[in-house]
């Protein structure tokens, strides 16, 4: 995709996000669906679309660490833990951080923590940079169906009119690894 077409797709996606709606976009392994993390309306639409209970909590993806800082509490991290995290980012490793009381429950669910990732997918980086904040991100698939890996699969599951940022996944076969930022405990193998 040339930069002008990519810019148009990103601008269109931001318009949809500003309407408190859900978009689909390629990530490292599969297409994701996401929305504005600060909009309870948008997050509830995403959860309804995915038939996912709010208490499970969600993942935020960002262009850089600074975008994640308002949503997480990194004050307990040691220098070694920071080094470990930053050696994995940007990339397909998600870390679960303590969440401050100001992080909305529609993001954390029943937890006092939040899963976050700095993506290395250039299209998602550009999208988050243009939007100025992270996105809620979960795999693009309806309950019981496999995650979508192409624009056509997204349209087949969600409908032809569903807003999709066109692009390619990075070809990873597995979803992102998930680890505890403080303990390093592996929650999901990547």
From Swiss-Prot:
BP GO annotations: regulation of translational fidelity; tRNA threonylcarbamoyladenosine modification
This protein's UniProt keywords: ATP-binding, Cytoplasm, Nucleotide-binding, Nucleotidyltransferase, Transferase, tRNA processing
Signal peptide extent: none
Catalytic activity: L-threonine + hydrogencarbonate + ATP = L-threonylcarbamoyladenylate + diphosphate + H2O
SUPFAM superfamilies hit by this protein: YrdC/RibB
InterPro entries: DHBP_synth_RibB-like_a/b_dom, Sua5-like_dom, TC-AMP_synthase, TC-AMP_synthase_SUA5
Residue ranges occupied by any YrdC-like domain in the UniProt entry: 7-190
Main subcellular location of this protein, as a coarse class: cytoplasm
The EC number(s) this enzyme carries: 2.7.7.87
Cellular component, GO, one term: cytoplasm
Subcellular location: Cytoplasm
A molecular function (GO) term: ATP binding
One Pfam family per UniProt: Sua5_yciO_yrdC
Role this protein plays: Required for the formation of a threonylcarbamoyl group on adenosine at position 37 (t(6)A37) in tRNAs that read codons beginning with adenine. Catalyzes the conversion of L-threonine, HCO(3)(-)/CO(2) and ATP to give threonylcarbamoyl-AMP (TC-AMP) as the acyladenylate intermediate, with the release of diphosphate.
NCBIfam families: PRK10634.1 (NF007919)
UniProt similarity note: Belongs to the SUA5 family. TsaC subfamily.
Protein name: Threonylcarbamoyl-AMP synthase
Organism in which the protein naturally occurs: Shigella flexneri
Encoding gene per record: tsaC
């Amino acid at each position: 995709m040339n930069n002008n077409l990519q810019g148009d797709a990103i601008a269109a996606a931001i318009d949809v996000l500003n309407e408190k709606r859900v978009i689909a976009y390629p990530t490292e392994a599969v297409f994701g669906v996401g929305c504005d993390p600060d909009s309870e309306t948008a997050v509830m639409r995403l959860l309804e679309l995915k038939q996912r209970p709010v208490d499970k909590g969600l993942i935020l993806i960002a262009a850089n660490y600074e975008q994640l800082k308002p949503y997480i509490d990194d004050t307990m991290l040691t220098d070694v833990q920071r080094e470990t995290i930053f050696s994995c980012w940007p990339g397909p490793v998600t870390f679960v951080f303590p969440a401050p009381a100001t992080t909305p429950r529609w993001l954390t669910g029943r937890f006092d923590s939040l899963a976050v990732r700095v993506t290395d997918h250039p299209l998602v980086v550009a999208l988050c940079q243009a939007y100025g904040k992270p996105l809620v991100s979960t795999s693009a698939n309806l309950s019981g169906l496999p995650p979508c890996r192409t624009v056509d699969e997204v349209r087949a599951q969600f409908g032809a009119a569903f807003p999709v940022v066109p692009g390619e996944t990075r070809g990873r076969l597995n979803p992102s690894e998930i680890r505890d930022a403080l303990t390093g405990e592996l929650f999901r193998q990547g």
